Amino acid sequence: SLHGRVGTIPARLSGYGTRWEGDRAFLWAEGVVTQAAVFGEHLELTRRIEVEVGSDEIRMTDEVTNRGFYKTPHMYCYHINVGHPVLEDGARYIAPIRDVVWAAHADSYDGQGVGYRALPGPQTDFHEQVWQHEMGTDAEGEVPVALVNDRLGLGLMATTRKDQFPCLYEWQNLQAGQYALGIEPSTHHVLGNGAARDRGEMIWLTHGQ
């Protein structure tokens, strides 16, 4: 599959409920996805989603554990895709960008003329663009990235830790009918498995890790 089998495996609901901190109520749900194969990996993803009642923040915590007995490679990338109405002509990509370190669309960029900060409306015959940015962090080591629509007063911000997700990509698919922008924090470069191994950057999980 395009991004690994885990994306098409149903989760098993392992719990849900309400927890309290003083007079603050938090709703939570937790699920487990198991990806396993004979002579292959046995990985378990535990995801917890939590929201404080009355807030506009959703907190998601993922933990991947190797339940098998083979040393197993581990790569992780989120695809946080935002579309209309937040994404429209004039929407802004806001992030603590220090530098552009890689782009996947050098052959088409000059003709398309779309940069990484200000977004146009839906395009015809648009070829997807992917930017990798070197990001700064706040005092807690976090990287806040947002897509903001000033006209509507709407936006979405995703915050991750740079020590957990050192790579961050902006995916632009501005083609009419598929119009979306992806905020994509990743443990590795999107060149994939082979590149991570060749560079000595692959994360390996042993049993119980």
Description of each model-found segment:
Residues R151-Q209:
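Active-site pocket scaffolds in enzymes
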Residues T18-A25, V51-S55, V86, L174-Q178, ...:
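A short, structured loop/turn motif at beta-sheet edges
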Residues L2-G54:
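Extended, loop-rich substrate-binding clefts of extracytoplasmic carbohydrate-active enzymes
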Residues R24-W28, E44-T46, E57-R59, E142-P144, ...:
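Intrinsic-disorder/low-complexity, polar/charged segments enriched in Ser/Thr/Lys/Arg/Asp/Glu/Gln
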Residues G83-H84, E88-T160:
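Active-site/ligand-binding surface loops and adjacent short beta/alpha elements
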Residues I9, E30, E140-G141, L154, ...:
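Membrane engagement elements in two modes
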Residues Y76, V82, E88, R199-T206:
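Targeting-peptide/extracellular-domain and disordered-appendage signature
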Residues V33-I80, T206-Q209:
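Acidic, contiguous internal or C-terminal segments within carbohydrate-active enzymes
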